[in-house]
Design a protein with these regions (language model features):
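Multi-pass membrane proteins that catalyze or facilitate reactions on polyprenyl-/lipid-phosphate substrates
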Residues: 1-212
């Protein structure tokens, strides 16, 4: 969980303009602070369901992480769904307004990924497409939504580790070096993967990932 912090940073690095200088500012559509508020408010709205339901069903989630049958079935169901999701949902429009209601709906659909074996990215992308976002816009918002969601999960796990007296494990032996190295590798690989993924799904859709 700690290593995924590198992947979180990769999203911010790739989309730093979206996080710190939204397009609506350049076009003069909104003032800087209005654009920033709208962007981050949508992230907060989309994250709230995961926070609430994640805390409520934390015991169920952790107790089923090792349920091989459940994970296996969910991978199969998710894969089949991805094979046909491009046909199920009509192509989104670039003119679709990304409202708070749409952000909240995507946030709730993201919670399906709390079932072990369900991909968080898949659930949020499908959520975006169900709200008539384009494949690219849905995929990008999935990555944006991963930042607060994964950061929160990382902080929670570190807190649990420290509160149970395991904080010394972070610095024991070569653990700290391993975590730092793992985070750097995750950062680099995530940047390459995100670039490839966005370009691929924009052109070809999600069927190949369903087979995967």
């Amino acid at each position: 969980v700690i290593i995924q912090f590198g992947a979180i940073l990769s999203v911010i690095c790739l989309y730093w303009k979206r996080f710190f200088y939204p397009d609506s500012v350049k076009t003069g559509e909104k003032t800087y602070w209005k654009a920033m508020f709208d962007f981050y408010a949508r992230l907060v709205v989309g994250t709230v369901p995961a926070v609430v339901l994640g805390l409520a069903f934390n015991d169920f989630i952790e107790s089923n992480l090792g349920n091989v049958q459940l994970v296996g079935w969910m991978l199969v169901v998710g894969g089949i769904f991805m094979l046909f999701c491009d046909k199920i949902f009509n192509k989104g429009s670039e003119q679709t307004k990304f409202t708070y209601k749409r952000a909240l709906t995507i946030g709730f659909i993201q919670c399906i990924a709390m079932i072990p074996g369900v991909s968080r990215s898949m659930s949020t992308i499908v959520g975006g497409m169900s709200q008539r976002l384009t494949r690219k816009a849905a995929a990008e918002f999935s990555f944006f939504l991963a930042v607060p969601t994964m950061f929160g999960a990382t902080c929670l796990e570190v807190y649990k580790l420290i509160s149970h007296g395991g904080g010394s494990l972070l610095t024991q032996g070569n653990n700290l070096v391993t975590l730092i190295l793992g985070s750097v590798v995750a950062f680099v690989v995530a940047i390459l993967a995100i670039k490839f993924f966005i370009n691929y799904v924009t052109k070809y859709g999600f069927a190949a990932f369903g087979w995967y």
